[in-house]
């Protein structure tokens, strides 16, 4: 009986967390040679109509610890849902964004990019108020066993 009650509460807890899970975090790690110029370019991009209508909260962070690769900074795009992710990705072909990439190509070398589903949210759910991210990098050798 104790196992049943324990299982019930664990299932309830996991289900409640799943209801709070929503959206995606896209991260783009870059090696920036001139941080000030890159920040200015990002500010200029985000002040355009393209930037004002972009369907994600955009944040630029400097890595404090990174023994994984040569990236110095990460651009984080916090999407609320699948629709926002699709619109954001589609907007990367816009001439305004393509111009930003051309202007910053001498400043920033792309190192890595990833798309992550938000598993658990907590506290204040407004993306503007959630500017701290923890990313775990794992190498899974047997995905089928890991998924179990």
Model-identified regions with their sequence ranges:
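Positively charged n-region of N-terminal signal peptides that target proteins for export
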Residues: 1-4
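Bacterial N-terminal signal peptides
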Residues: 7-16
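Short S/T/G/P-rich N-terminal loop/turn motif that feeds into the first structured element of a domain
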Residues: 19-148
């Amino acid at each position: 009986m104790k196992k049943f009650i324990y299982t019930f509460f664990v299932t309830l807890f996991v289900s409640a967390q799943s209801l709070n899970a929503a959206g995606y975090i896209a991260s783009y790690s870059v090696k920036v040679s001139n941080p000030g110029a890159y920040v200015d370019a990002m500010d200029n991009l985000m002040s355009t109509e393209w930037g004002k209508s972009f369907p994600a909260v955009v944040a630029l962070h400097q890595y404090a610890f990174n023994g994984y690769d040569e990236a110095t900074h990460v651009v984080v795009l916090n999407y609320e849902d699948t629709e926002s992710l699709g619109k954001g990705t589609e907007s990367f072909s816009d001439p305004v964004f393509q111009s930003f990439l051309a202007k910053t190509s001498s400043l920033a070398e792309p190192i890595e990019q990833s798309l992550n589903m938000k598993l658990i949210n907590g506290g204040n759910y407004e993306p503007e108020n959630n500017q701290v991210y923890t990313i775990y990098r794992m190498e899974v050798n047997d995905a089928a066993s890991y998924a179990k």
